[in-house]
């Protein structure tokens, strides 16, 4: 086997060696890591192998938990009791100090367990209160930290496999303290020139320690000096611990180079590798010989048995008992100081740190010293070696000097520690057996009494044994191996220690096939072996120091009488300077301020982003003003005369809007940027006007208080501009004959004194409720309470009167409508141009409670325009035109004339040109007046054709389904009737001659003999509950009902996110003990890791909410029933908001982590981050700024926080409205965001990267969706028509691109060029697929749609610029195309869900009008809305459908729900007037439609039942509902109930909005 390995080595290194080297290296070169020193077990003795016990382990749990208090005494107490003693007692055998430190050097060559284990475990030593060294202030809370050593992870699993520590160096006597324990370490020590080890500037010294050579570099406990400067590169990590150990390392360094130089002279053809290997094997052999045959006998006073050859079955592994015995015994012989002398026996003085001179080097002040002033030259090192050779060590007993006991280099934050107490803890960490068990296991005689441990000690100092026995409760079986072995030692190691040490060295020698005496390994010849055996340490010293042999005694490990250079005296602590005291290190010292500034800076990121956004907003506002000035110069030449620009303050929660104030005679006009009039204020005497000016903040605010109006607050850029406005106002008020008062207030008080439009509307709403409660007998609780505030502002608001414009707006009509003019003029009794509450109340009383005569008289007075008591034909025509205007209908003048002539002729007034009130009342009574009252009927005369056509309805109400009370129904005498019609406010049947199944046959003079099935459409009205609790419960139920899909999806999403958080949090809290990080930062790591998992999930899947093409596709699948794809943007915002909150928590967790990492010692950090830190004993961790700015996760994390702060601030509602371009540009930082996220987690600082697990799939889908969007061309479109409709709806009609095909019900994305070419918003197309243009109805519900409405406001003249163009992208979404597959279809639209049906209705009518083959014969459209005010634009489309529906295909029903809850003026007027005015021309007053407007909820089940009666031949009816989930759920429930019957099947299809 040896031959084969030698051959393999030769083949491996041969090609790279010089020819001479290949010929000279004839042996198998020994590895540096200890492998293959034993061919039986290759790993024995290798670096990293476990320690091999001589005695079974003794742990508390039998596995790994060490024994401790109270079972065993406190280590510090035991150290003080059994091992404290005075210094200055010489060795009984005259052993020298050189032998002591040579023993430490040999021990460093054989074993090293100083590296802490991972995860970090601590066996801290509690210091008894009042300890003179460590607790002089008697605090009682001092703890000396002790970290357990590294162990084999394959051990410590069970009592049969207890924990075993690992050896960090080779377990062979192979010179690893000289050459290192690995090939790479050795390479760092070599110079690769002449076979020598690398030296520094001085050839006598090696080069200094540096990376990647990880020398042990703790701070100097005496001075606090840190770093590798002044420390040399040795094979042993702790070779620089003391100058004395360092001197021995320098000795062997110089000896190797001396051998290499000698070999180079003898063999000039050898190369570097050959010289190095020959010198190395010679040095190792010499080191083995000196250790085994010179030092060991001097240490044990025993010679090992003769070497008999290599024994492959002998396990040479180091035992923990050997480590404890040897190290502990060495410590008893360490003196308090060490002499230095030259070759002429001159013991020189030593320079201390304070420049004083002392007899010797103080040991306690020499630990880890750097650039020692007494060891600057090679001669100084020689002097130290000579001094140690002549100095007698301390006595070999149980006592230890204070330099070792109290002032040993301390770990972690302590500069000092008790070495003996630490050794005791180390023994417990090793699981060492008790003293008695060890003796028994090693075959030594048992000890049964404390005095038998050391009879000599019992006689001379029995108090020590007694005190020790007391600490162990007189139980000898508890006595530990270390104190027991020390107590039995006196002059020589006791029997236990001697047996352990001798056994270990014999096994090391006999189990090593590379031992220099093994003649079979080919290393040395017999002659060379004999030469090596004859080489002593004295020979080495003489060779290296170039001194004469007479300067040293023959055996440098002893000094006997007559030997050269005796020491002056046995050193004691009195002869030496005091030890530097204990220093508590503060790792965070000096970092508090910077750490706080860093955290404050991170917290200021949002503020900086806010400041940036504010600057951008200001720049945008300034540019906007500049553009306004430029535009107005060309557009408003005439208009600017007497006008001034300003900002109107609308309230604290409302944004200021730029306006133009134009003063005219008797009026103040407030206009927007396109000169559309926003408000007109009438100036009529005798009003008292108050003018309030601000006195601070630049004196640029003005408040105009005019009675009967809400206040006008204007803000100017400069005080001068305000002054000009004040002067103009004063002139205008004087011209109008108005008196005014002027005073000043602070701007804040001025704002509080202003009555805003919103405040007035709230006050008037409550007041209106009380008015209607009196008229309609509504419960006062439903009407609401009047404000209790009695301030001047409230009193002024309650005395306000409605202007003509406000009156029209409250009715939802245009101010110029004739109906508004007529009613306003009639109600304005005092003629002051305003309508008081009492005046309006009088009108309401007549409408609601007046008799038919009173109501007809009111109508007569309304339309008696000239007030002469007569209504002419022209005035009658104007009356009809007023109703037509209300209906937004367009009838020609000829048609109106025909209607009037027919009505006059039927009443017998064909010869009259004017009507008195009696004539007017008779005409209405005889013809259509019945339609205005509750109990009237039409008699004897056929309805005129024009009225018949207008009266044709698509809805019928079955009297069988209604309560036939006398108040709501009336029957005329049948003998006088040709056609009987039931006419009530709730049910109406009009004759029609279309649609054969519904035809009613009319015969003059005959009754209706055939029964016609009628459709039940009566609304189901629910009592509105005013109880706050009931409202809250109902609101919650409706919320859950309407958003059940949203709630379900959110529940799933946040359950996953929460599960990820909990999984990571649980893992790091309870399952990551092997990492040890939770012991360092429990809260911080749980918070940061848990949030990191959730953030990874959220930031990944948030991309799916922006995959518009995918969402468009999925909306057309069954998934749309479970996932609200239309809420993707809202979901995007919600995820983003949650993610930013978690990001803040994640950052907070890492702030805690950084702080704790900054105060954690390097030994702990090297366990937590083995790829980032190497424990070199320096203890000091990296500063906080290193974690923040010099690590990849830290730096990317800071950058991510900055990017997120920018993105989130600019994405907020306010700044998105101020500068959408800023939002768009900053939101494109998401690319950099995801790049940094990937980099942030890829460093694997705490755990392996996991972000890609969540990110990969959504990213691929998102990229694919983006590519689809990029492949689709966006078309630029010109706007053909723009119209501002009531309730903030803007109607845009624009060109249809060539090849643009879509289905009714689909939607598009548009971008207005004036608002930015990159901001797209989705809207449903309200045009039909057959139309040449595309149309949208856009409600101003947000900042973008509001600005769109302003941009497309109607121009004031023909010279204004054309409308801005649009970008069109689409179409998207689901087309509701299934309706045409049913002979009868029911379309149910609720809320915004009516939008897709607008296109469908128009499409159906068109196909019918062009005789297109359409299977569908009848469509019932049910429009359910909270108030029709929100969707007046749909009424226009329905009106268009009605007028084009010549085949009576569409039947429309409108249901307005929750009247009492809404209860505003307009809805209340609708409730009062609808039943009276909808009968005029058979149209609704407010919708302008022929359909009846119902108040309540649609009765779906009765409606579907009656539908079966109306269409008995239809076996399958399609029901399509679109709107809130609550409505579609009711439709579904009704369909299911009807489908239980064996009749018509109702197939329900729904889509929720």
Swiss-Prot record:
Molecular functions per Gene Ontology: calcium ion binding; heme binding; NADH oxidase H202-forming activity; NADPH oxidase H202-forming activity; peroxidase activity; superoxide-generating NAD(P)H oxidase activity
InterPro entries linked: DUOX_peroxidase (IPR034821), EF-hand-dom_pair (IPR011992), EF_Hand_1_Ca_BS (IPR018247), EF_hand_dom (IPR002048), FAD-bd_8 (IPR013112), FAD-bd_FR_type (IPR017927), Fe3_Rdtase_TM_dom (IPR013130), Fe_red_NAD-bd_6 (IPR013121)
Principal location listed in the UniProt entry: membrane
EC number(s) reported in the record: 1.11.1.-, 1.6.3.1
Annotated keywords: Calcium, Cell membrane, FAD, Flavoprotein, Glycoprotein, Hydrogen peroxide, Membrane, Metal-binding, NADP, Oxidoreductase, Peroxidase, Repeat, Signal, Thyroid hormones biosynthesis, Transmembrane, Transmembrane helix
The FAD-binding FR-type domain, residue ranges: 1272-1378
Residue positions binding Ca(2+) 1: 828, 830, 832, 834, 839
GO biological process: cuticle development; cytokine-mediated signaling pathway; defense response; hormone biosynthetic process; hydrogen peroxide catabolic process; response to cAMP; response to oxidative stress; superoxide anion generation
Pathways per UniProt: Hormone biosynthesis; thyroid hormone biosynthesis
Positions in the Cytoplasmic compartment: 618-1046, 1104-1138, 1212-1228, 1272-1553
Residue stretches making up the Ferric oxidoreductase domain: 1089-1271
Subcellular compartments: Apical cell membrane
Expressing tissues: Specifically expressed in thyroid.
Mechanisms controlling activity: The NADPH oxidase activity is calcium-dependent. Peroxidase activity is inhibited by aminobenzohydrazide.
Subunit structure: Interacts with TXNDC11, TPO and CYBA.
Family: In the N-terminal section; belongs to the peroxidase family.
Identification of the protein by name: Dual oxidase 1
UniProt source species: Sus scrofa (Pig)
Gene transcribed to yield this protein: DUOX1
């Amino acid at each position: 086997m040896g031959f084969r390995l030698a051959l393999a080595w030769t083949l491996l290194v041969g090609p790279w060696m010089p020819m001479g080297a290949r010929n000279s290296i004839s042996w198998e070169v020994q590895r540096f890591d200890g492998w293959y020193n034993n061919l039986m077990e290759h790993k024995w003795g290798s670096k990293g192998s476990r320690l091999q016990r001589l005695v079974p382990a003794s742990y508390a749990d039998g596995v790994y938990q060490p024994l401790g208090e109270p079972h065993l005494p406190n280590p510090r107490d035991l150290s003080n009791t059994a091992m404290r003693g005075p210094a200055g007692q010489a060795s009984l055998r005259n052993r020298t100090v050189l032998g002591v430190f040579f023993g430490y050097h040999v021990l460093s060559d054989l074993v090293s367990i100083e590296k802490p284990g991972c995860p970090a475990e601590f066996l801290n030593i509690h210091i008894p209160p009042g300890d003179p060294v460590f607790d002089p202030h008697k605090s009682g809370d001092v703890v000396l930290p002790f970290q357990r050593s590294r162990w084999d992870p394959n051990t410590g699993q069970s009592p049969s496999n207890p924990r075993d520590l690992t050896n960090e160096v080779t377990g062979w006597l192979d010179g690893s303290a000289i050459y290192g324990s690995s090939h790479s370490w050795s390479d760092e020590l070599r110079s690769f020139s002449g076979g020598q080890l690398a030296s520094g500037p001085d050839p006598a010294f090696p080069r200094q320690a540096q990376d990647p050579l990880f020398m042990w570099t703790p701070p100097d406990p005496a001075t606090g000096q840190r770093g590798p400067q002044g420390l040399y590169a040795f094979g042993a990590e702790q070779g620089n611990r003391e100058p004395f150990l360092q001197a021995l390392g320098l000795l062997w360094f110089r000896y190797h180079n001396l051998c290499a130089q000698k070999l180079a002279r003898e063999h000039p053809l050898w190369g570097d590798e050959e010289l190095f290997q020959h010198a190395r094997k010679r040095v190792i052999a010499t080191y083995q010989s000196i250790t085994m045959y010179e030092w060991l006998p001097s240490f044990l006073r025993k010679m090992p048995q003769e070497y008999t050859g290599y024994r492959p079955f002998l396990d040479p592994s180091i035992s923990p008992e050997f480590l404890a015995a040897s190290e502990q015994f060495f410590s008893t012989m360490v003196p308090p100081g060490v002499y230095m002398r030259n070759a002429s026996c001159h013991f020189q003085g030593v320079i201390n740190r304070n420049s004083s001179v002392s007899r010797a080097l103080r040991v306690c002040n020499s630990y880890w010293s750097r650039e020692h002033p007494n060891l600057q030259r090679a001669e100084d090192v020689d002097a130290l070696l000579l001094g140690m050779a002549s100095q007698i060590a301390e006595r070999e007993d149980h006592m230890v000097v204070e330099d070792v006991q109290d002032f040993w280099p301390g770990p972690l934050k302590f500069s000092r520690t008790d070495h003996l107490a630490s050794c005791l803890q180390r023994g417990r960490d090793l699981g060492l057996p008790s003293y008695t068990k060890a003796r028994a296991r090693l075959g030594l005689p048992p000890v049964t009494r404390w005095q038998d441990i050391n009879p000599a000690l019992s006689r001379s100092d029995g108090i020590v044994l007694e005190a020790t026995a007391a600490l162990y409760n007189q139980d000898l079986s508890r006595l530990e191996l270390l104190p027991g072995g020390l107590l039995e030692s006196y002059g020589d190691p006791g029997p236990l220690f001697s047996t352990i040490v001798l056994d270990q060295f014999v096994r090391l020698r006999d189990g090593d096939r590379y031992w220099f005496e093994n003649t079979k390994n080919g290393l040395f010849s017999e002659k060379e072996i004999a030469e090596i055996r004859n080489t002593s340490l004295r020979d080495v010293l003489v060779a290296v120091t170039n001194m004469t042999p007479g300067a040293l005694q023959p055996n440098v490990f002893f000094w006997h009488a007559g030997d050269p250079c005796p020491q002056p005296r046995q050193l004691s602590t009195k002869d030496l300077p005091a030890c530097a005291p204990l220093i508590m290190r503060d790792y965070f010292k000096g970092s508090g301020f910077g750490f706080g500034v860093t955290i404050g800076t991170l917290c200021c990121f949002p503020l900086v982003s806010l400041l940036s956004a504010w600057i951008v907003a200001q720049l945008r506002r300034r540019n906007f003003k500049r553009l306004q000035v430029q535009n107005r110069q060309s557009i408003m030449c005439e208009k600017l005369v007497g006008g001034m620009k300003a900002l109107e303050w609308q309230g604290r929660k409302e944004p200021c809007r730029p306006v133009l104030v134009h003063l005219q005679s008797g009026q103040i006009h407030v206009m927007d940027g396109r000169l559309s009039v926003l408000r007109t204020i009438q100036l009529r005497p005798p009003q008292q006007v108050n003018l309030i000016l601000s006195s601070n903040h630049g004196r640029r605010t003005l408040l105009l208080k005019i009675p009967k109006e809400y206040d006008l607050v204007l803000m100017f850029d400069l005080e001068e501009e305000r002054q000009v406005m004040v002067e103009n106002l004063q002139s205008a008020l004087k011209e109008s004959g108005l008196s005014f008062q002027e005073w000043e207030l602070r701007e804040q008080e001025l704002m509080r004194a202003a009555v805003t439009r919103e405040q007035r509307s709230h006050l008037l709403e409550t007041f209106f409720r009380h008015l209607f409660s009196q008229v309609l007998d509504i419960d006062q609780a439903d009407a609401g309470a009047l404000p209790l505030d009695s301030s001047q502002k409230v009193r002024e608001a309650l005395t306000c009167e409605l202007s003509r414009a406000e009156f029209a707006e409250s009715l939802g009509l245009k101010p110029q409508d004739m109906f508004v003019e007529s009613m306003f003029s009639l109600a304005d009794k005092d003629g002051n141009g305003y309508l008081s509450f009492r005046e309006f109340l009088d009108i309401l009383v007549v409408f609601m409670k007046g008799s038919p005569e009173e109501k007809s008289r009111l109508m007569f007075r309304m339309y008696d325009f000239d007030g002469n008591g007569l209504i002419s034909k022209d005035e009658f025509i104007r009356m009809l035109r007023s109703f037509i205007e209300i209906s937004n209908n367009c009838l020609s003048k000829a048609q109106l004339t025909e209607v009037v002539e027919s009505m006059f002729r039927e009443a017998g007034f064909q010869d009259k040109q004017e009507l008195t009130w009696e004539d007017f009342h008779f005409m209405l009574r005889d013809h259509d007046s019945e339609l205005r009252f509750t109990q009237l009927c039409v008699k004897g005369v056929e309805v005129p054709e024009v009225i018949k056509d207008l009266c044709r309805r698509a809805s019928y109400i079955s009297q069988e389904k209604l309560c036939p009370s006398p108040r709501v129904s009336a029957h005329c005498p049948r003998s006088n009737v040709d056609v009987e019609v039931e006419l009530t406010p709730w049910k109406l049947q009009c004759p029609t001659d279309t649609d054969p199944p519904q035809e009613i046959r009319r015969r003059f003079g005959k009754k209706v003999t055939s029964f016609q099935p009628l459709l039940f459409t009566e609304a189901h009205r629910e009592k509105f509950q005013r109880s706050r609790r009931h409202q809250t419960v109902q609101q919650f139920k409706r919320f859950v009902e309407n958003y059940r899909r949203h709630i379900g999806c959110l529940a799933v999403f946040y359950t996953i996110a929460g599960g990820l958080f909990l999984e990571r949090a649980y893992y790091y809290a309870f399952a990551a003990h092997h990492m040890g990080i939770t012991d360092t930062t429990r809260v911080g790591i749980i918070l940061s890791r848990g949030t990191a998992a959730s953030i990874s999930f959220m930031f990944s899947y948030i991309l799916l909410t922006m995959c518009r093409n995918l969402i468009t596709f999925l909306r057309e699948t069954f998934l749309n029933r479970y996932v609200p794809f239309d809420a993707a943007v809202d979901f995007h915002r919600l995820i983003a908001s949650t993610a930013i909150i978690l990001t803040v928590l994640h950052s907070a967790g890492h702030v805690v982590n950084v702080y704790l990492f900054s105060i954690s010692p390097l030994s702990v950090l090297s366990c937590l981050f083995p790829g980032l830190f190497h424990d070199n004993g320096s203890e000091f961790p990296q500063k906080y700024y290193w974690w923040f700015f010099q690590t990849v996760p830290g730096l990317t994390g800071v950058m991510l926080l900055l990017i997120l702060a920018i993105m989130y601030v600019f994405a907020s509602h306010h700044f998105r409205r101020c500068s959408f371009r800023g939002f768009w540009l900053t939101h494109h930082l998401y690319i950099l965001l995801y790049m940094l996220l990937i980099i942030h987690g890829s460093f694997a600082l705490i755990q392996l990267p996991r972000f890609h697990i969540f990110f990969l799939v959504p990213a691929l889908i998102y990229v694919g969706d983006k590519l689809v969007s990029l492949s689709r061309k966006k078309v630029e479109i010109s706007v053909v028509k723009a119209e501002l409709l009531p309730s903030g709806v803007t109607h845009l009609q624009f060109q249809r691109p060539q090849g643009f095909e879509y289905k009714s019900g689909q939607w598009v994305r548009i971008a207005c060029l004036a608002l930015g070419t990159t901001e797209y918003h989705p809207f449903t197309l309200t045009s039909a697929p057959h139309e040449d243009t595309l149309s949208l109805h856009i409600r101003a519900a947000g900042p973008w749609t509001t600005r769109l409405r302003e941009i497309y406001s109607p121009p004031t003249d023909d010279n204004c610029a054309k409308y801005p163009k649009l970008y069109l992208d689409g179409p998207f979404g689901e087309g509701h195309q299934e309706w045409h597959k049913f002979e009868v279809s029911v379309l149910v639209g609720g809320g915004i869900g009516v939008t897709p049906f607008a296109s469908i209705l128009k499409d159906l009518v068109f196909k019918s009008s062009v005789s297109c083959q359409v299977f569908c014969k009848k469509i019932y459209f049910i429009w359910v809305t909270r108030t029709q005010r929100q969707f007046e634009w749909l009424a226009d489309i329905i009106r268009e459908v009605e007028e084009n529906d010549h085949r009576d295909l569409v039947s429309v029903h409108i249901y307005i729900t929750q009247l009492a809850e809404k209860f505003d003026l307009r809805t209340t007027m609708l409730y009062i007037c609808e039943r009276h005015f909808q009968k005029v021309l058979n149209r609704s007053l407010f919708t302008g439609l022929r359909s009846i407007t119902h108040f309540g909820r649609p009765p779906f089940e009765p409606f579907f039942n009656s539908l079966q009666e109306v269409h008995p031949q239809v076996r399958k009816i399609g029901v399509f509902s679109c709107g809130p989930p609550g409505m579609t759920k009711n439709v579904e429930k009704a369909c299911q109930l009807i489908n239980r019957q064996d009749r018509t099947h109702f197939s329900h299809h729904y889509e929720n909005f």
